[in-house]
């Protein structure tokens, strides 16, 4: 019902036409009500107020993100995030540059150390031999060199045992003869 009354009031104003007389409007320099010349004030003569001033614009977040550091291996990180935009319309926020160049290749590992000193299967000046022993425990006439690549005295003894011979360290192995032999 209120809507209908308002519609009727507006319609009657439109039909009535303009109000006689002119009313120059002066805008105050502050928010004080406007004044009108003597006579009837127009219907819309409530104090005129200008709209509030728009708020201050925010700071334009023009901070650029930092550059990524140089990576030691695998390249640096990309630049940091740009600063936040201030106010309604932030400034141009640029992300940082791509990460720095990748670091140099890692150095090559050093060479492995040499193996230990060669294994001495027999004391100095003695030659390893696999010999058949006589009944008295003295080396028989048949001796032969053990397999190559033996790495311990126990491997030397096992190698000779596989052939049914005994590991011996001989002073003079000549033509398959074991002379002056002893146990390793």
From Swiss-Prot:
Record's GO cellular component terms: extracellular region
Induction, as annotated: Expression is down-regulated by carbon starvation but not by depletion of nitrogen. Induced during invasion of plant tissues.
Annotated signal peptide: 1-16
Tissues of expression: Expressed in the mycellium.
InterPro entries for this protein: Cerato-ulmin_hydrophobin, Hydrophobin_sf
Knockout consequences: Does not affect the hydrophobicity of the cell surface.
Origin superkingdom: Eukaryota
Main location: secreted
Location(s) in or outside the cell: Secreted
Disulfide topology: 122-169, 130-160, 131-143, 170-181
Residue ranges of the TM segments: none
Xref: Pfam families: Hydrophobin_2
Keyword Signal carried by entry: yes
Keywords: Disulfide bond, Secreted, Signal, Virulence
PANTHER family assigned: HYDROPHOBIN
Family according to the record: Belongs to the cerato-ulmin hydrophobin family.
Record's function text: Aerial growth, conidiation, and dispersal of filamentous fungi in the environment rely upon a capability of their secreting small amphipathic proteins called hydrophobins (HPBs) with low sequence identity. Class I can self-assemble into an outermost layer of rodlet bundles on aerial cell surfaces, conferring cellular hydrophobicity that supports fungal growth, development and dispersal; whereas Class II form highly ordered films at water-air interfaces through intermolecular interactions but contribute nothing to the rodlet structure.
Subunit text: Homotetramer. Further self-assembles to form highly ordered films at water-air interfaces through intermolecular interactions.
Record-given protein name: Class II hydrophobin 6
Organism: Passalora fulva
């Amino acid at each position: 019902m209120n809507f209908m009354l308002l519609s009727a009031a507006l319609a009657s104003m439109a039909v009535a036409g303009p109000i006689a007389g002119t009313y120059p409007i002066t805008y105050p320099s502050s928010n004080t009500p406007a004044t009108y010349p003597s006579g009837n004030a127009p219907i819309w003569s409530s104090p005129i107020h200008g709209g509030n001033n728009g708020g201050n614009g925010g700071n334009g977040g023009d901070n650029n993100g930092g550059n990524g550091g140089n990576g030691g291996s695998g390249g640096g990180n990309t630049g940091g995030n740009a600063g936040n935009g201030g106010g309604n319309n932030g400034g141009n926020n640029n992300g940082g540059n791509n990460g720095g160049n990748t670091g140099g290749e890692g150095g090559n590992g050093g060479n492995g150390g040499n193996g230990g000193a060669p294994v001495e299967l027999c004391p100095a000046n003695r030659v390893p031999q696999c010999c058949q022993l006589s009944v008295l425990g003295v080396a028989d006439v048949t001796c032969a060199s053990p397999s190559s690549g033996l790495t311990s005295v126990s491997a030397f003894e096992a190698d000779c045992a596989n052939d049914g011979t005994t590991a011996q360290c001989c002073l003079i192995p000549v033509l398959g003869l074991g002379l002056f032999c002893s146990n390793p």
